[in-house]
Amino acid sequence: MNAPAILSRLLVSAVAVMSVLATMLPAFAQDKGTLDPKPLPPLTNPNDPHLAAKQLFGRKTLPTAGAPRVIGFYAKGCIAGAEELPITGPTWQVMRLSRNRNWAHPAMIALLERLSAKIHKDAGWPGLLIGDMAQPRGGPMITGHASHQVGLDADIWLTPMPNRLLSRNEREEMSAVMMVRKDRLDIDPHAWTPSHLAVIRDAAKEPSVERIFVNAAIKKALCREAKGDRSWLWKIRPMYGHDYHFHVRIKCPPGNPQCEHQTPPPDKEGCSARDFAYWFSDRVLHPKPPKVPPKPKPPITLAQLPADCRQVLAAPDAKQ
């Protein structure tokens, strides 16, 4: 087999593996929580240079004291001085409290509070159900996400908040509603409503929002149904999974020089057949596992994160 053919086969296998993994990971947010979360056991050798950084950050239950500071990239960084989104607000409720992932930069906290109030008015929802944001000090997570590391990402359920206070048990047990048809080619018309478009549109029109990740079938519906001003559609990016929630990512806040910016998405609607060709291809919708399973990718170590993340881990807890 010649070199181009080998390369082509490797690329196809890699895409298949990515498709399988990416469709599995978002399902984690649908996993049920517990009313009695057990603390993780102490690490035998926390200074082991080969230890996965997620084991260190996953054991921090409180943020650092001091001013908020974003360090690194969305998928490779941490945050100092994170703030906690109150678990219940006038127009939002936090889900899966046992995960302790309702922390973020104050800019994200302000966005969620403002956005939930706007959606209550524009979409008629009682409020938003908020999923994973970040850990108290950000960093890699033991389960679930590759990003959400610097306090600038948040998952919002596509299920309206009930018009009542959810119990702690309901917040651990309740599941979000699947928005995508079983064939993955379009939204489920029995679940999707015009209010869902209004919710995502309101989020996309926020100036601080840089990207919103949704399933390709949801992006397809938005392209089809959006009327009038469509200038916000370019922020909506198709992604594996994301079929019962959408993922909001905001820009690096001013005054955070250590925050690594992401290249903005192309300034176009992204609604052409060419834009959807990959996402609705057979290799993505029905990926075949490679004949030889790939070796697991080594986890990120503390040495691979920005140097200041070591200080974030060592800093004293903020007073509660």
Residue ranges of model-derived segments:
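Extended, low-complexity, intrinsically disordered C-terminal regulatory tails
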Residues: 59, 111-143, 213-235
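Solvent-exposed N-terminal domain segments of exported/luminal and surface proteins
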Residues: 33-68
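Envelope-exposed proteins and targeting segments
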Residues: 124-129, 150-154, 208, 242-246
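Bacterial N-terminal signal peptides that target proteins for export
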Residues: 2-14
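Active-site acidic/histidine clusters and adjacent loop/turn architecture
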Residues: 66-130, 192-202, 206-209
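Bacterial N-terminal signal peptides
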Residues: 12-23
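Catalytic cores and adjacent binding grooves of peptidoglycan-active enzymes
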Residues: 30-47, 166-320
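Sec/Tat signal peptide C-region and signal peptidase I cleavage site
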Residues: 25-29
